[in-house]
Amino acid sequence: MGPCRGALHPLSLLVQAAALALALAQGTLPAFLPCELQPHGLVNCNWLFLKSVPRFSAAAPRGNVTSLSLYSNRIHHLHDYDFVHFVHLRRLNLKWNCPPASLSPMHFPCHMTIEPNTFLAVPTLEDLNLSYNSITTVPALPSSLVSLSLSRTNILVLDPATLAGLYALRFLFLDGNCYYKNPCQQALQVAPGALLGLGNLTHLSLKYNNLTVVPRGLPPSLEYLLLSYNHIITLAPEDLANLTALRVLDVGGNCRRCDHARNPCRECPKGFPQLHPNTFGHLSHLEGLVLRDSSLYSLDPRWFHGLGNLMVLDLSENFLYDCITKTKAFYGLARLRRLNLSFNYHKKVSFAHLHLASSFGSLLSLQELDIHGIFFRSLSKTTLQSLAHLPMLQRLHLQLNFISQAQLSIFGAFPGLRYVDLSDNRISGAAEPAAATGEVEADCGERVWPQSRDLALGPLGTPGSEAFMPSCRTLNFTLDLSRNNLVTVQPEMFVRLARLQCLGLSHNSISQAVNGSQFVPLSNLRVLDLSHNKLDLYHGRSFTELPRLEALDLSYNSQPFSMRGVGHNLSFVAQLPALRYLSLAHNGIHSRVSQQLRSASLRALDFSGNTLSQMWAEGDLYLRFFQGLRSLVQLDLSQNRLHTLLPRNLDNLPKSLRLLRLRDNYLAFFNWSSLALLPKLEALDLAGNQLKALSNGSLPNGTQLQRLDLSGNSIGFVVPSFFALAVRLRELNLSANALKTVEPSWFGSLAGALKVLDVTANPLHCACGATFVDFLLEVQAAVPGLPSRVKCGSPGQLQGRSIFAQDLRLCLDEALSWVCFSLSLLAVALSLAVPMLHQLCGWDLWYCFHLCLAWLPRRGRRRGVDALAYDAFVVFDKAQSSVADWVYNELRVQLEERRGRRALRLCLEERDWVPGKTLFENLWASVYSSRKTLFVLARTDRVSGLLRASFLLAQQRLLEDRKDVVVLVILCPDAHRSRYVRLRQRLCRQSVLLWPHQPSGQRSFWAQLGTALTRDNRHFYNQNFCRGPTTA
């Protein structure tokens, strides 16, 4: 809505730019538009599709900026002056602005140009990230640089002059400059001694560069050297000469095992890799060594001589399946803490048993052992016999080995063991002790091996989508048996596992009826995960053998609940004295269950994904289903197909509730006053429902509500002061709704206390003079993503753009734009017409001018009537509450508050009538002091009382003044309209308006009503029938 569109378009752009600059200079808008200032001096400009570095205002506190992130934009040219004003800039991120064509999503060619002094102008710069940019040379860099990332670029040559002068540099990343995703004609060329001048360099990463040898002349200060996934197939002591300070060396993936590769792979030549016995002997400070994916068939003990400080050794994805059972290479690694031997399987072979070599017993400091993907079918005492005396062993990974027989009791002999992962196997029940035979069984055909990245499973308690269940990471002993073939659970499985505290049995096929005897040996169990099974909850003593059970996950056990006619008993919950967390989510519970849950200890219940709507529809049968949970603090009722939530439903929830989730239901109405029935409620989640307005009341006074999530609804209207009484409210999420504005009247004095006010993803109407801009600027510290993620939904030219694309407070409105255009057009027309008319008919014009001059005084006297006080007198039946509500909350708001400068003056009985005057005096004054008389009718068949009297006065005014002032608004159009209405529709259609049923037609209705109230009715009369009333 720029001023004076069309003819003055260049002028409008100038006015807008000047207005925006003025606003920025005054400090009223966010200082770093279009970017966002975040804590710790970070200016975030990520994902803004910028084509150049923003020119921030001189008034912005650029001196306080220490970090600038321009990640994932479209900046292809960096100038000398781009960063000169950031005098304290320390970190600069320019990643993903102009990626090489092969890395670009659309494979578009791109080249980034960096002028010579771009970074030299920032002498304080310490961290620079230029990754994923199409640059071929290293730009000039300041000597203050500490960390430099040039990964996934087109830099293929490093020589001594390239990084000269970077004496403070400690971290250098040059990964992926020449590999299958970023192909080149040759390998990365590192000249001998090219990095030798970097005396403080400690971290060097050259992964994925097609290197065939270790670069010569590396600085002796290096502590981390990463050379994985190149083509270095020989290693000798001279390759790592002088690197005595190395702590981590990664040379994995240089001679790959291609039958387990997840990306393009070059087969390792026969007889390689070749590692000299003394390759690592001089690296006495080495703590981490990675030899994964290196096609190793054996381990030479001499490789590890001198590595007394080695703590982490990764030997995964090799061919060490035989070596594991007899190697002596581990005897000297007394400090080793983590050992990874995963996916050292024999192609097409699965072992019947596995014996770990005796040298494993010398790893006295070993804390974590990963042997998943070896493929052996039986786990017995002899399998882990070598580990029995390791006092520090805490974590053991045995997943994805196709184990079908497992003696779980063997883990009772490991007093320090904290986590055992046996997931993704084929365990079907308890196993008898078996002697090891060492035999192998050949598979019948090729096996498709899963990728290693999908197998690095974390602990059982890794937080997921649901935050109700506690994590197992802090517990002393966790056993994960998820994704196996268990059909039943037998107490014999858990013999000698009394100290087990967390047990995962999810994603099995357990279909038995638990009766209180399945977990008898697990007297200390605190967390039990039985999700994604087929448990039959019939017995009232289920799980009662677990006296210390605190968390029980029974989610996704829907099959028994879907069986028609089968009952389910949940009374066992009352008999678990320590139970605090219970999940019954996604079970489709709808009928034939216990009428009430009872527990004195339960604090969190996840009941999402059920059909509570059907349960509450059964009269009072399940009305008190949750009432017996006296200590309940958190309750999740999401995805329960709720269409309504009656006050009695909330009244029968536990009064101790602090968090209530009602996400993703079908709620189109919510009784806000009923929140008073939950006196301790602090957080309410109503996201993903079908609320269209916040108009029925307001948040009750005295509520303890602190967090309210209303995102993902269709809210388009909020009544004033809706949130004002919730004085403790601090976080409000209104994102992804249909709001066209955000009014300060919604919040009252609460606005300043809000810590989070999320209004992103709303179609805000960015009209000139939009009041929400000033309000959002006042509370901008609480609005996440205000500069870039709060966007306009209309008008069309601003749709999808930031609300600060132009300053909506200083731009001119549309009416003034037309005035500017009309005046300029008139000036041009007069400058052309006046000389021409003067030349052709000057005397005639002089005569007409004086004739009009003599005629004007009479017209002036005739029009010299006092200006009317109101634009319209609104008449309606106050007895009809729905009509009165529409007049006060819709009609008045639209015509008086939302029209800006074109606001109309309405005369309302209860607001504008003068006390002390008679009814008739006020009525007469209202009709004769208003330009129009607006009748708001619910129906047209019966009109009486004040409506009838007002109509007669309006008709009298028609007879006396010859002015038709009647405008009809019919809220509920019916087929049987009065004859007067039908006649008036014939003669003067624009003065009879019908309230549209569809919200999409309301905008047109208000426009028509504004026209009907501001123009004379005689212009609306149908000329085929009459000419309308005329003045004398």
Curated annotation (Swiss-Prot):
Cysteines joined through disulfide linkages: 35-45, 98-110, 178-184, 255-268, 258-265, 472-502, 766-792, 768-811
Ranges of residues in domain TIR: 868-1013
Main subcellular location of this protein, as a coarse class: endoplasmic reticulum
Lipid group attachment sites (S-palmitoyl cysteine): 258, 265
Keywords, alphabetical: Cytoplasmic vesicle, Disulfide bond, Endoplasmic reticulum, Endosome, Glycoprotein, Immunity, Inflammatory response, Innate immunity, Leucine-rich repeat, Lipoprotein, Lysosome, Membrane, Palmitate, Receptor, Repeat, Signal, Transmembrane, Transmembrane helix
GO CC annotations on file: early phagosome; endolysosome; endoplasmic reticulum; endoplasmic reticulum membrane; endosome; lysosome; plasma membrane
GO biological process: canonical NF-kappaB signal transduction; defense response to virus; inflammatory response; innate immune response; positive regulation of B cell activation; positive regulation of B cell proliferation; positive regulation of immunoglobulin production; positive regulation of interferon-alpha production
Topological region Extracellular: 26-815
TM helices/strands, residue ranges: 816-836
Domain of life: Eukaryota
Pfam family, one: LRR_1
Alphabetical list of SUPFAM superfamilies matching this protein: L domain-like (SSF52058), RNI-like (SSF52047), Toll/Interleukin receptor TIR domain (SSF52200)
LRR repeat feature ranges: 62-85, 87-110, 122-147, 150-166, 167-190, 198-221, 223-242, 243-268, 283-306, 308-332, 333-356, 363-386, 390-413, 415-440, 472-496, 498-521, 522-545, 547-574, 576-600, 602-624, 629-652, 654-677, 678-701, 703-725, 726-749, 751-774
Protein's membrane topology: Single-pass type I membrane protein
Binding-site positions, DNA: 47-51, 72-77, 95-109, 132, 152, 179-181, 208, 262
Secretion signal span: 1-25
Acetylation as UniProt keyword: no
PTM: Activated by proteolytic cleavage of the flexible loop between repeats LRR14 and LRR15 within the ectodomain. Cleavage requires UNC93B1. Proteolytically processed by first removing the majority of the ectodomain by either asparagine endopeptidase (AEP) or a cathepsin followed by a trimming event that is solely cathepsin mediated and required for optimal receptor signaling. Palmitoylated by ZDHHC3 in the Golgi regulates TLR9 trafficking from the Golgi to endosomes. Depalmitoylation by PPT1 controls the release of TLR9 from UNC93B1 in endosomes.
Cytoplasmic side: 837-1032
Gene3D superfamilies reported in the protein's UniProt record: Ribonuclease Inhibitor, Toll/interleukin-1 receptor homology (TIR) domain
Family: Belongs to the Toll-like receptor family.
Complex formation: Monomer and homodimer. Exists as a monomer in the absence of unmethylated cytidine-phosphate-guanosine (CpG) ligand. Proteolytic processing of an insertion loop (Z-loop) is required for homodimerization upon binding to the unmethylated CpG ligand leading to its activation. Interacts with MYD88 via their respective TIR domains. Interacts with BTK. Interacts (via transmembrane domain) with UNC93B1. Interacts with CD300LH; the interaction may promote full activation of TLR9-triggered innate responses.
Function: Key component of innate and adaptive immunity. TLRs (Toll-like receptors) control host immune response against pathogens through recognition of molecular patterns specific to microorganisms. TLR9 is a nucleotide-sensing TLR which is activated by unmethylated cytidine-phosphate-guanosine (CpG) dinucleotides. Acts via MYD88 and TRAF6, leading to NF-kappa-B activation, cytokine secretion and the inflammatory response. Upon CpG stimulation, induces B-cell proliferation, activation, survival and antibody production.
Name of the protein this chain belongs to: Toll-like receptor 9
Protein source organism: Canis lupus familiaris
Gene label: TLR9
